[in-house]
Regions:
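Extended redox/cofactor-interaction regions of prokaryotic respiratory oxidoreductases
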Residues: 2-4, 180-268, 275, 293, ...
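N-terminal export/assembly segments and adjacent metallocofactor-ligating motifs
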Residues: 2-307, 333, 458, 466, ...
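A glycine-rich phosphate-binding loop feature that marks nucleotide/adenosyl-phosphate handling sites
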Residues: 166-167, 315-318, 372, 415-426, ...
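Long, well-ordered, tryptophan-enriched scaffold segments
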Residues: 260, 271-375
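Short beta-alpha connecting loops at secondary-structure transitions
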Residues: 280-286, 546-557
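Active-site phosphate/pyrophosphate-binding segments
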Residues: 331-452
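Phosphate/diphosphate-binding loops
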Residues: 505-506, 553-572
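Long, contiguous, secondary-structure-rich segments that constitute the structural scaffold
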Residues: 564-614, 706-708, 712-723, 727-812
Length: 812
């Protein structure tokens, strides 16, 4: 397709054939270059006869990708020689299919034997962040932690102790690292009076908050297997081809279901993702942060052409038009009035209006509206990229309106407009007791809680459980997480706050590797990998099949590493709560106890020792496809939603109250309706005169956030690069592979450029999770996007707006 500036932004209808032709040469070049990877050599090992001393042990990849895949460790003489994946089941997603790990999980051996493994306890001897440590004994490390924790609780109270966000072992049971209230650290702290909790998460803070006011609670979605009943699939910023790419993830279901239904698939995203890769029917590029404007333009077409499902809106919804508008709301405060320009702003949300904001041609908006409205049923889904913006909460509510307006909620082949859902087994988790501290903050506001804790209030900063914080954070537990620095926004600000050890006086990091965050520890404890201990792995997003993995111990712990259960049990002994913490059980004892509890709810589970040999237990949803809100759709009176009205709330009275009472900075908007609001650092911000490019992030296939970010073969196979459109590159004299600088007022990153038509003009992208590697001037040399992101939170969730950034790019 021919693109001419300055109309490039409006040339947004991209055919699959045209894009594949454009990118074919680059793809062939990549396939034929001289990069040598040892995957082939390793795979041949599986074909050779197994030595007599070899044993195969079931293990798991427990990271935060949505899958949690089984791994089969081939162990010889106490060492892992190679890794395979699930060999049970078949290729048919109608049955108990195989759950095949991706290259990340299959490279687990390289994590276990990585040169940067933490070997023994250490204490800091330099400044935080310098990575200067000296070895100490376990006794000294645990004594130091226990005595400092007791001192800080005595001086500041339990509210001063914070459990930081960490998802490195999210899929574990005893080793589980998130949410904080479900971890062994939480159990230990609850035995000692509690801790300052957090709500929300870096993955989905805004969508969780926003759609709570639409559907009540966490917004569910149909399983991707149900796409076999769909005529059309529309994905807003949903990229399972990279975010959930293994056999336990969504890509497998998406493709197999579409083969049955022959459903068209349209991807709406600033970047042409691997979920497309020639499998989609159309890619529609869109400016980041403008999804709600597109939805408003689509809604205008649907309403004016009488394409909405009026009976559904009348029966199941609140606030679509004057008939269902709640008492006390403004007379023109309903959604239909907003779209038609009869609301307070007086602007009709026509396709022309939406086109100037989104960069999508008017004609394509009109066509898309008709396609969505007339496809019966349509599977409309949003990933978690669109919500990770300054206006993310309101954008998520807007995207869900497409499913609501067309009556696709609660039926086979439809969806709620949220991310895809899945079936899960009721497996018992580790009990963590009750937290006596009721106060919590947003997971994104912890640096502020260090810097200005007593100034933080409920109405201004989202403090929950009381009107304000009484004390700042004085101690941080950082278990299996890289959010002290690497995964938290505005790294340079976080560095300045953490480096002052008079503010937060004690930081304990528990990890397997010397991560970017580990360098900020006062006490650094070496954890065991999943291969070096026994646990259950679960919580996979796997369509209409769920499973539990027996992740057994394949090898002995390396060096002086201990399990998290050993560490916390030893600390409990020093703190005088050992009996309450352990209840007399070892790690295996807890596993046997939890397993027997689980068998009460899942009677088909085999006995413990049989399951240990079996390695994985799979079970299909007895209802067939998971259909979100099916019971509500069938009988809304008997099965109301958990919203105040019991219905889908297009107009939220609760949001109206929040909008009237919360203290918001200029530019932040909370509204009872799913309107379009640009948010800060938007495409039309005056700041674009200085920083003209929008920078967005994405989940890169070589890592799960930052996990696996230190594996050499994955880094070589999937190089960290900044994606930039040829139009923007040409203006700056940038060629593919050139070293460039990306910068704004928050920091600077040096990285190589990937010049590609797979990016929308005016937008650049960096895969999140690259390990922060600053030089002496604090210029990052690894492509860590959070050097450039902001710590200003989103309005409602107080979440991370990681994809809302303005930058400039120059060739070095």
């Amino acid at each position: 397709m021919k693109i001419k500036a300055p109309d490039a932004l409006l040339a947004a209808e991209v055919s699959r054939r045209g894009l594949m032709k454009t990118t074919a040469i680059g793809g062939l070049a990549l396939a034929s270059n001289a990069l040598t990877l040892p995957f082939t050599r390793l795979s041949h090992a599986a074909d050779t006869p197994a030595p007599a001393s070899e044993k195969v042990v079931w293990s798991a990849c427990t990271v935060n990708c949505g899958s949690r895949c089984p791994l089969r460790m081939h162990v010889v003489d106490g060492a892992i020689k190679y890794v395979e994946t699930d060999n049970t089941g078949d290729d048919n997603y109608d049955g108990l299919h195989q759950v095949r790990a991706c290259l990340r999980g299959r490279s687990m051996r390289r994590r276990v034997y990585n040169p940067d493994r933490l070997k023994y306890p250490m204490k800091r001897v330099g400044k935080r962040g310098e990575g200067k440590f000296e070895q100490i004994s376990w006794e000294e490390a645990l004594d130091t932690i226990a005595s400092n924790m007791q001192r800080l609780i005595k001086e500041y109270g339990n509210e001063s102790i914070y459990l930081n966000y960490g998802t490195g072992t999210l899929g574990g049971t005893l080793t589980r690292s998130w949410p904080p209230g479900k971890t062994l650290i939480a159990r230990l702290m609850n035995c000692c009076g509690g801790y300052l909790n957090h709500y929300g998460d870096y993955s989905s803070a805004q969508i969780a908050a926003g759609l709570n006011y639409t559907y009540g609670g966490w917004a569910d979605g149909n399983s991707p297997s149900d796409i076999e009943n769909s005529q059309l699939v529309v994905l807003f910023g949903n990229n399972p081809g990279e975010t959930r790419m293994s056999g336990g993830g969504v890509t497998y279901y998406l493709e197999q279901a579409r083969q049955k239904s022959n459903a068209r698939m349209i991807i709406i995203d600033p970047r042409y993702t691997d979920t497309g890769a020639g499998r989609e029917d159309e890619w529609i590029p869109i400016r980041p942060g403008t999804d709600a404007a597109l939805v408003s333009g689509l809604a205008w077409v649907m309403i004016t052409e009488n394409l909405v499902d009026q009976p559904f809106l009348d029966k199941y919804c609140v606030g679509y038009d004057e008939k269902t508008l709640p008492a006390g709301a403004p007379a023109n405060g309903h959604y239909k009035a907003y779209i038609l320009g009869q609301g307070t702003d007086g602007i009709a949300k026509t396709p022309e209006w939406a086109s100037t904001i989104t960069g999508i041609p008017r004609e394509r908006i009109v066509k898309l509206a008709r396609e969505i409205a007339t496809a019966k049923p349509a599977y409309i889904s949003q990933g978690w990229g669109p919500q990770r913006h300054a206006n993310g909460e309101i954008a998520t509510r807007a995207i869900s309106m497409l499913a609501i307006l067309t009556g696709n909620v609660g039926i086979n082949g439809g969806n709620s407009g949220a991310r895809e859902g899945s079936y899960s087994l009721p497996f018992e988790r580790m009990p963590t007791l009750e937290n006596s501290v009721e106060t919590s903050i947003s997971m994104f506001m912890w640096t502020d809680a260090i810097e200005r804790g007593p100034e933080m209030t409920a109405l201004r900063d989202g403090v929950r459980g009381k009107d304000k914080l009484d004390v700042p954070i004085k101690m941080i537990w950082n278990y299996a997480g890289n959010c002290l620095i690497n995964q938290h926004s505005e790294i340079n600000r976080a560095h300045e706050i953490l480096q002052d050890d008079k503010k937060c006086e004690m930081i304990v990091v528990i990890d397997c590797h010397m991560t970017s965050s580990a360098k900020y520890a006062d006490i650094l404890l070496p954890d065991c990998t999943a291969s070096e201990q026994m646990d259950f792995a679960l919580d996979a997003s796997c369509g209409n099949m769920s499973y539990v993995i027996f992740a057994d111990q394949a090898i002995k712990p390396r060096f002086e590493c201990k399990t998290i259960y050993e560490m916390t049990s030893e600390l409990a002994k020093r703190l005088g709560v050992e009996e309450q913490f352990t209840e007399g059980r070892t790690q295996e004892g807890w596993m046997r106890y939890l397993y027997e509890q689980s068998r009460k709810a899942i009677p088909d589970l085999p006995d413990f020792d049989t399951f240990r040999q079996q390695g994985i237990y799979k079970q299909r949803d007895p209802q067939g496809h998971h259909v979100a809100y099916k019971a509500f759709r069938e009988d809304p009176q008997a099965n109301p939603l958990t919203t105040p009205s019991g219905k889908i709330e297009i107009y939220s009275q609760d949001l109206a109250k929040i909008a009237a009472t919360w203290e918001l900075p200029e530019g932040d908007v909370i509204d009872p309706l799913p309107i379009y609001t640009p948010g800060f650092e938007n495409y039309n911000d005056p700041l674009t005169a200085k920083y003209p490019l929008q920078l967005t992030g994405f989940h890169y296939k070589s890592r799960v956030h930052s996990t696996y970010g230190n594996v050499d073969v994955l880094k070589a196979a999937c190089r960290q690069e900044m994606w930039i459109n040829p139009i923007d590159a040409r203006k700056r004299g940038i060629a593919n592979g050139d070293r460039i600088r990306i910068f704004n007022d928050r920091g600077e990153v040096h990285i190589e450029a990937k010049v590609t038509p797979r990016m929308m003009p005016g937008v650049v992208a960096l895969g999140e999770g690259a390990w922060y590697n600053p030089d002496a001037s604090r210029v990052d040399q690894a492509g860590s996007i959070n050097v450039l992101t902001t710590q200003r939170p989103s309005p409602l969730a107080k979440g991370n707006p990681s994809h809302t950034n303005l930058v400039q790019v120059e060739k070095l």
